[in-house]
């Protein structure tokens, strides 16, 4: 199908084959109708996808190296991020990234309402300083914060690779790969499934 995003879309992942089978069975046992808006697993299939850019595309896809995320968070100079910097610096690997992502998406809303604005202020100050290493990331955080105030996905964006595709370039997203399309037009080539797990930017 053709994807045309003129604004950031939801932060999402598609389940693996095993997760799809187990999730579908679990929701069937719970009696959740296939058409229900709270249903996650509408079939038993996994859903890897390939996105081919028809125009330029900006996206977030997959966890960036933990060390780079630590550098980014330190560059924003936000004291409220210090505990999370320490968490990831102490476990600078895929498990540490998943732990931090899980922490943020399960944060109570009152805590998000404090942390997200602090991060946005840090991004503004970073851009005003003239620093450029994380310019694209800081601008993305600001754009998402304006569009989705108080959303944990704004924080999660700091954990993901910021990608830019030119027409004809493509990105492959295996099942389980966390991603969000920000802007652009592309052709999605996917397995035959409607399973989407959304967690942020909604």
Predicted regions and their residues:
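Active-site region of the double-stranded beta-helix
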Residues: 1-169, 179-202
